């Protein structure tokens, strides 16, 4: 009888453990060097990819998806069309089915943009949403909400394409994540004016460059965890790292490898 009770207790513990694990949201920040690629796995199982790194990074993502059993992407968000964000998107489209793509409403003359658009044309089942100026859309996957906002302007001047970056706010229970693409001063100011941007986890804008990341923006976000997509050849500015550390943020860099952050809806932790 005692043995039977122990077996039942163990089975119940395993069941409750699996149930708790199934309710976790996972966000993986991939080490792409000075390039962006993040994979969100919803508690209900949907897969959301934000950016796809460079062309080389796209190949790494395809290999990683095959290894980890990621057989489809429910939503792919391309924040803007710089080669270190869209460069690997064609490889993703060629390697797994992608149900939906959200991208900003401008075009770019580049090889990477052309390859991405060509790959999209070869994926007729992929629904494409273009967010033009002031556009906004929200997706819900089970208990998570993902709100995506477009830039407010149609012209930020010469060489200011980064300010067209889509921003993505992810909410699960009491926890919040903010993904900022390469938002520079003008776009960060828009986000500040739009309302509360406090978050538990922040993907630091524009690879942590001090000249392009405002202290006011970081202070308003006040994240518990931050990830910077930088590289040994082009590291984040120490001023940005120090600003974050001084507010108690646990700062992580792509130079240290992948980062996996988990939320149970009440708190976040590094896994």
Predicted regions and their residues:
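Non-globular, low-confidence helical/coil segments that flank catalytic cores
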Residues: 3, 19-271
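Bacterial N-terminal signal peptides that target proteins for export
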Residues: 1-8
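Bacterial N-terminal signal peptides
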Residues: 8-16
